Amino acid sequence: VDIPYKELKNGERNHVRTWYKETVRPLLTAQIIDPSHPFPHLKNKTLYAAALLREGDKRRLGIVGVPDVVPPIVMLPGRPGAFVRTEDVLLHHLRKLFKIYQVEEQAVISVTRNADLSYDEAMDQEDLDLRAQMAKLLRQRERLAPVRLEMQGEAPALRELLLQRLKLTPEQSYV
């Protein structure tokens, strides 16, 4: 049973908070996007927490990647089958990652990249190592253009900014 973070009981909240501090927080790196820090490459189908940040009269975009080693859910003790989603926990703690900024909007996002590669065109006829060729093909796919933005949460200004940065249309985003 998926339990929203807001509905956790005190003991469960303490369990999740400890798990976050000990397991997840040390793995996170918050990135502030500005003229000296360009928009990062977002991996295909990887979860990110994104935030629209304000410092005085300046707005910035903040992004935190969720490493693959972080489990997607946290089981809750004392409630068999009950869990909270990792992205829900991350959004709850996001303000602490961007301490000097005011978080105006936040959402969990995922980008889907184009996967349209031609096997025949990508194969080097001189290199017959199929595994190496497939690995090369998969690395190329990671760098292809985004075709979809998925967002969990209502954040219209953040959505607009992300669509602009990813060069996507509103029809290519799903909330």
Predicted regions and their residues:
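N-terminal non-catalytic structural scaffold regions of very large proteins
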Residues: 1-175
